[in-house]
């Protein structure tokens, strides 16, 4: 391992170069190389900005971004070309208010990454302004808050190009369900325990919403207790050996419905019948039919675990834990 510095001459021509290192100055031996790109340095002639109005956006709304560019010496980039690209990615929601900081909001199950949505090419107006629009909706993970971002690339008459960006959060519904941790047990819960939780409904501004504006009368809250099971699948291979793999199954152990209550904290309870990992899911819809989903995980201890002796492909052996 070695390191060092190489100072480029002032009159070095821009282009692609390769730095090669030979041992013992023998160019017939093995060498290591590194690609280097040398470019002209040019001071910026103009500045640009992209802004999105700071309002609350919900899935299905249209987002409009304002783009502007001006010369640093004064004057707008009238007629300059620009391109825009929109992307989105899941970001989730968490409360900043200390009163709600320990609550879980939104789903856990599901995966989505950054996705490209749309691109456009346009020209700035006489006062150096432009815009870009994007319709939201059809997000992959139901009940998840998404971050929508726009990047604008602006090119002036001298072919200098700079980029600017802006982003905003798009909420899945008019409100979220905040779900507490287990309230009546410290440490791990045990199989057969009744577990108490609390939930509260909050809007994106972290306030308790007016029920008449976000839900219909007698809106139901679905409560699902889901057990995470790993099924052992074994197959006999070509040479008689046993090949083992595990497949996850999410088994709904308990499902109930009750009237959704909007106000202060509201109690709910579940009773796991087995040991292992569990998922508790609360779901409903707002007045526009948008999904509101919150999930949390917890673990339950028990003596349910059994082990399959894989030393023989022709017999199954069990060892009891009691005589």
Where are each of the predicted segments found?
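A structural signal for beta-strand and strand-to-loop patches characteristic of beta-rich domains
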Residues: 1-323
């Amino acid at each position: 391992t070695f390191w060092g510095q190489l100072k480029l001459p002032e009159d070095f021509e821009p282009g692609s170069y390769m730095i090669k290192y030979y041992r013992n100055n023998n160019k017939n031996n093995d060498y290591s190389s590194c690609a280097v790109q040398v470019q002209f340095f040019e001071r910026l002639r103009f500045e640009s900005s992209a802004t999105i109005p700071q309002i609350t956006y919900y899935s299905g709304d249209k987002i409009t971004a304002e783009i502007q560019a001006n010369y640093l010496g004064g004057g707008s980039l009238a007629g300059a070309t620009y391109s825009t690209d929109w992307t989105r990615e899941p970001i989730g929601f968490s409360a900043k208010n200390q009163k709600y900081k320990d609550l879980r909001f939104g789903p856990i199950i599901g995966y989505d990454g950054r996705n490209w949505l749309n691109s456009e090419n346009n020209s700035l107006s006489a006062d150096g302004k432009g815009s870009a629009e994007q319709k939201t909706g059809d997000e992959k993970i139901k009940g998840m808050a998404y971050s929508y971002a726009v990047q604008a690339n602006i090119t002036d008459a001298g072919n200098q190009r700079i980029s600017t960006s802006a982003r905003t959060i798009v909420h899945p519904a008019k409100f979220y369900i905040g779900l507490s941790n287990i309230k009546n047990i410290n440490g791990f819960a045990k199989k057969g325990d009744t577990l108490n939780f609390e939930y509260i409904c909050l809007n994106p501004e972290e306030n308790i919403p007016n029920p008449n504006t976000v839900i219909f009368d007698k809106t139901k809250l679905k409560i699902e207790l889901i057990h995470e099971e790993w099924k052992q699948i074994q197959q006999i291979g070509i040479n008689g050996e046993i090949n083992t793999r595990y497949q996850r199954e999410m088994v709904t152990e308990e499902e109930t419905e009750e009237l959704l209550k909007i106000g202060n904290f509201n109690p709910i309870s579940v009773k796991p019948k087995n040991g292992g990992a569990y998922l508790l899911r609360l779901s409903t819809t707002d007045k526009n039919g948008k999904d509101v989903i919150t999930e949390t995980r917890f673990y339950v201890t028990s003596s349910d675990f059994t082990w399959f002796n894989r030393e023989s492909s022709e017999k199954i052996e069990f060892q009891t834990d009691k005589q």
